[in-house]
Amino acid sequence: MADWSYGGYAAKYGVVKGGEYDIGTGHVKCCDLTEELPEFMRSAQVVFVDPPCSQGNLQSFYTKAGVRLENQFSLFLLKLFECIQEIAPQVCFIESFASNIDDVKTFISTEFRYMAVIHSHYYHNRKNQCWIVAGVNKEPEGWEDWCMSVHDMDEQSIIREICSAIMPKSTIGDLCMGRGLVGFYANKCGRPFVGTELNPNRLAVLFERIKTGKL
């Protein structure tokens, strides 16, 4: 049987479904974004999110969280976009893949005045292609140069650069925190962050990372 405990940190830190926590410089909740958008998420002026990218990927996320999947991927994506609209960030980054990039680009180009598509890869392997689709209504100082500087970087490095350089005094939010790269790097920079995550086992990894200061 597969082990999806992610190190067992949920038990160590008492992270449970529905729980809301202060951790480092951030505030997070273990919840399903298709069911609720916590009020505190609306404080995010910058959003970065790496959401499930297909029906199979979405099913895997719910299976690992021990939650029955009730929605089709198209409905999940619609709800994600609605959450971003409610937050109304000044800058939004959505990590995308071949299976969902067209939908993401359509959303970003509709909701924001300017769009940039940054080529990237994940797990430190250039064969694992992805794209960071960014939207802004008012370009931050040095925006175009920054986008060029991170082009082709590993997505982990791009997240680090976003946390340190893009409106660094503002709150950054992540609707699908996973194991918490956004929270980890925001905390490293002393930056406030907010986030939600479906799976308490995955979210609890962030607690361990912040405690140890290591990924």
Which ranges hold each PLM region?
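Class I S-adenosyl-L-methionine-dependent methyltransferase catalytic core
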Residues: 1-215
